[in-house]
């Protein structure tokens, strides 16, 4: 619903428009709110990943513009000064720091998973690298180097597999042809379309 700046209708007319479009407006508001809060960092937030939990905690003993990291068992705690978390620049820096920490602590798991899936399908890869991009979650070079983003660690297990299997299919078809999708679907045990659709709807809890 668009109301131009030169609109001269009555308040009652505007109310009637809102009532007529109430359901659609609710859906739009819900979608916008979910997208906004999904990638927002705040005190007490817990982010669940396959390996465990990421906990964000405000702590007055932490110096300004600093982050203290503690790992115990299956949890990594990121502590920061309470006054910092309201800063958009600090949130951006904290997001980058969290992703670096994930890559350092769990990047080896993505490498192992990629090698295991390649071996399962009888594929040979030259190397596995861990990237940090959010827009491009995976890449396969013509020389057989597979790059998997650390952001994949934020995905559930089956979507991690989808990203990796998608790139492994590029070892055979360096395009997105019908043959490529047929092979990718084979690797995904018939779930390629469903997993692709699920990935498109996934809201990452951390955004750069």
Show which residues each predicted segment covers.
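Walker B beta-strand of ABC/ABC-like P-loop ATPase nucleotide-binding domains
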Residues: 164
């Amino acid at each position: 619903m668009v109301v131009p700046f030169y609109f001269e209708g009555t308040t009652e007319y505007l109310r009637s428009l809102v009532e007529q479009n109430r359901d659609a407006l609710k859906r739009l508001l819900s979608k916008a709110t979910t997208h906004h809060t999904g990638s927002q960092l705040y005190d007490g937030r817990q982010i669940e990943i396959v390996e465990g939990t990421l906990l964000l905690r405000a702590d007055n003993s932490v110096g300004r513009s600093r982050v203290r990291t503690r790992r115990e068992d299956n949890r990594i705690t990121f502590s920061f000064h309470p006054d910092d978390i309201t800063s958009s620049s600090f949130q951006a820096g904290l997001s980058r720091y969290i992703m670096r920490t994930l890559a350092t602590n769990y990047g080896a798991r993505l490498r192992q998973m990629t090698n295991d899936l390649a071996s399962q399908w009888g594929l040979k890869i030259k190397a596995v690298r861990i990237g940090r991009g959010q827009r491009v979650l995976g890449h396969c070079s013509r020389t057989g180097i597979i790059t998997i983003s650390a952001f994949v660690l934020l995905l559930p297990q089956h979507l991690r597999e989808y990203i990796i299997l998608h790139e492994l299919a590029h070892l055979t078809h360096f395009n997105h042809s019908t043959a490529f999708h047929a092979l990718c679907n084979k690797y995904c045990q018939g779930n390629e379309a469903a997993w692709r659709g699920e990935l498109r709807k996934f809201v990452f809890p951390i955004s750069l």
